[in-house]
A protein has these predicted regions:
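Residue-level detector of functionally pivotal "anchor" positions at catalytic/ligand-binding pockets or at interdomain
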Residues: 358-360, 419-446, 451, 506-510
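C-terminal tail/sorting-segment detector
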Residues: 442-444, 466, 485-510
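Glycine-rich beta-solenoid repeat tracts in large extracellular/virion proteins
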Residues: 73-80, 106-112, 129-135, 152-158, ...
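C-terminal accessory segments
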Residues: 346, 351-419
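Right-handed parallel beta-helix
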Residues: 85, 89-94, 114-125, 137-151, ...
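Acidic Gly/Asp/Thr-rich repetitive segments characteristic of extracellular carbohydrate-active
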Residues: 33-67, 72-73, 352, 384, ...
């Protein structure tokens, strides 16, 4: 079974529409296919009919719950604030936006509006982008499913401090799964799955031609699963004019262009000083390099990665001569093909080590001696060469793997995105929402869970704000006493996505 993130349309229906007022927040509104825009929007019985009408009415602090059904999208130009964001959140398991909004050719367009959250909708078959945000800082897009949109699943431009998490973006017809552009700084792109997109899986392009400084600084890209992208070119993680990127705990496999590409094309400066740590990259046989740094993209630090290329001669790492300055790499598993002269040349690991790189790195064993099930399950075998062969000193503070397992489990960090857990064999088929349904109990004043589960329990209020997180790897409970009485959504996420969710009412401490 491929590691997949279950998108937000798997949310279980909240069982009630009860709401107690929370003074620090704005109004809660409702949209339903059986609603009417002449209604107040204050309950499901009085729901509005269209998302655009809701977008025209909301103010800072308001939340809009969206019932199951098919909708045209919305264009939002009203801003929220840090303490009072505007949230559009799917209430059921299938709130689908399958027609563009009335202003642009995107499903959702958020423009000149900050502190907006979009949560849990499915956006499909759009003429341009599934979800578009421009001139929109401090926004969140989470738990969405963006399929078969012409340009990209999620597109952003001039969006500082954006958070994109737990989204699935697939089958973009022309370009990328996720595309962050135009001088956007401090992006966090985590726990997404991007697959079968025509070009890149995740692209950040600073694009100085559109204004701004043409540099995107300090993004964090981690916990993502990216596969089967790039038939028309475009790296699985493609960075143009991006500086100070921190790229870790990602699984990239069977992509058809570069794994991680650092370059300058539209950006005003090269993609310098990237830290690339604890990733697993398995390139397809028709791919380019696992890691490529060109156009002066110097200073890359490459440690504790599995970098396996199935191409006939392209290999693990290639640097242009002008990207060599400040580069360092070690404790990687590589193929016997590397280059400091760009794409057209290759040398052996021994020759590469003579240049001062990868002194403690090793040539990869066959895939079936490293991974549980190459092609579908890239957990490490317990006796894989990657186990205990990494270095904590070069882990850049990363003390968990892609699934939240603590590093190290043995005497030293394992190489790659996954940390082996001794004799534990992870059965992808067994970890299903049914296990979580039977293993998690919502009581009057607490949420408890049994042994044998994995993941992170998160509680969200009606505004879509995450108000609590707890690891559930051992039996325990979370008391609700600190919550304000009201309606809440409990979810469990693993790096494979949303596994379980349930709405509940907390009536207060007894």
């Amino acid at each position: 079974m491929k590691p997949t993130f279950k998108p937000a349309y798997h949310l279980l229906l909240l069982l009630c529409c009860y709401l107690l007022a929370i003074p620090s927040y704005g109004a809660t509104k409702y949209v339903s296919t059986t609603g009417n825009n002449s209604n107040s929007g204050n309950s499901w019985a009085l729901a509005w009919r269209t998302l655009q009408y809701a977008a025209d009415q909301v103010n800072a602090g308001d939340s809009v719950w969206i019932a199951d059904g098919n909708y045209a999208g919305f264009d939002l130009r009203t801003t929220g604030t840090a303490t009072n964001p505007i949230v559009f959140i799917a209430f059921g398991n299938s709130a689908v936006i399958n027609a563009p909004n009335p202003v642009t050719t995107d499903g959702i367009n958020i423009e000149d509006a900050n502190y907006i959250e979009v949560n849990g909708v499915r956006v499909i078959n759009q003429p341009r982008n599934g979800i578009r945000l421009v001139f929109a800082d401090n926004c969140i897009v989470r738990n969405t499913f963006c399929d078969n949109n012409f340009e990209r699943g999620i597109f952003t431009g001039f969006t500082d401090d954006i958070l994109l998490e737990y989204n699935e973006c697939l089958n973009s017809i022309d370009e990328h799964g996720i595309y962050v552009s135009n001088s956007s700084d401090r992006s966090i792109i985590r726990y997404n799955i991007c697959h079968h997109n025509n070009r890149g899986g995740i692209q950040i392009n600073a694009d100085g031609s559109q204004g701004g400084d043409g540099i995107s600084t300090d993004p964090e890209i981690y916990g993502n699963v990216i596969y089967e992208n790039g038939v028309a070119g475009g790296g699985a993680i493609n960075l143009d004019g991006v500086q100070g990127a921190f790229i870790y705990n990602n699984l990239l496999y069977e992509n058809h262009a570069t794994g991680i590409a650092l370059f300058q094309q539209d950006g005003n400066e090269p993609s310098i000083n990237a830290d690339i740590v604890h990733n697993t990259i398995i390139n397809a046989s028709n791919a380019r390099w696992c890691i490529l740094a060109v156009n002066g993209s110097s200073g890359a630090q490459v440690f504790n990665n599995i970098l396996i290329n199935q191409h006939a001669w392209r290999g693990s790492i290639a640097l242009d001569p002008d990207a060599v300055a400040g580069f360092d790499s070690d404790y990687n598993i590589v193929v016997n093909s590397l280059s400091n002269e760009g794409d057209g040349q290759a040398m052996t690991l021994t020759e590469w080590q003579a240049l001062g790189y990868d002194a403690n790195s090793m040539i990869a064993d066959p895939l079936n001696q490293i991974f549980l099930n190459p092609g579908s399950d890239y957990h490490l075998l317990n006796d894989a060469q990657a186990v205990d062969e990494g270095s904590a000193a070069f882990a850049f503070g990363i003390n968990e793997d892609i699934e939240g397992t603590s590093r190290p489990q043995g005497s030293q960090h394992d190489i790659g995105a996954y940390e082996a857990e001794g004799s534990l064999v992870v059965d992808e088929e067994e970890e299903t929402p049914d296990i979580y349904t039977s293993g998690i109990t919502i009581n009057a004043e607490s949420i408890s869970w049994a042994r044998g589960l994995t993941g992170t329990l998160m509680l969200m209020n009606v505004e879509g704000k995450v108000i609590a997180r707890r690891d559930i790897s051992s039996a325990d409970e979370y008391t609700l006493h600190d919550l304000v009485p009201g309606v809440y959504l409990a979810t469990v996420h693993t790096p494979r996505g949303l596994q379980w969710s349930k709405g509940f009412i907390f009536s207060g401490k007894r």
